[in-house]
């Protein structure tokens, strides 16, 4: 490990997420994938650990072709704590993603190594569930919101730096605890932007929603829009509404209407 990696004079990052990013299926994976590409481009050596320790194609091979070592398999799963301890002095930092994953690793890293930890929450779970509670009044959602609030603030307190994709989330965190080290970073999904586009948008037709339906708020948003808003639009404009996203439920699929 040391001879192979440190001889290159590059810093090594252990990047931990729930599984290898399925970058063509959901926004969180796309963001993760783009940041992995950026880290490699910036000269870091990246070791990627998916908490399910699965070899999933074509995604694992894509990372490996980028020069990222993916830690997977039953042998690695049984030795991950030993691996981290053995290589702690070779690693520059650990980048933990998502509260349900980060909470599995942060205590071991802080107690058994001197490594710096960056935590990226992807979204504030407690805020999302509290907003749903406000809509539904379901006390189970309030209980779940409080649970995630305790987890997320514990992680941010233990991490050396935390990131979220919006200033709204950062403001919410600082309203509760101004001392938390947290910043907003862009949900980075494109390598480059088109500066000049000759497309005549007046020729475009329809409305488009893009979002993975494994994320419940996306399904809620589409159902609400179709039932409450789209009929009002159709009274004035005969436009179509296109829904694009992975893992659509039967309820979402039932919205299909070619007419």
Regions found by a protein language model. Give the residues of each.
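Non-catalytic membrane-proximal stalk/linker segments that position and tether the catalytic domains
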Residues: 1-29, 35-38, 59-66, 193
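Short internal beta-strands
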Residues: 45-52, 119-121, 242-244
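Acceptor-binding helix/loop patch of EC 2.4 sugar-transfer enzymes
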Residues: 22, 115, 119-146, 171, ...
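Conserved catalytic-core segment of nucleotide-activated headgroup transferases in glycan assembly
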Residues: 24, 28-38, 48, 136, ...
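N-terminal strand-loop element at the rim of the active site
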Residues: 41-71, 75-78
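Nucleotide-activated donor-dependent transferases that construct or modify glycoconjugates
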Residues: 8-25, 51-53, 75, 207-213
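Short amphipathic alpha-helix with an adjacent loop that forms part of the alpha/beta core around
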Residues: 79-88, 196-199
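Short N-terminal targeting/anchoring amphipathic segment
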Residues: 84-103, 118
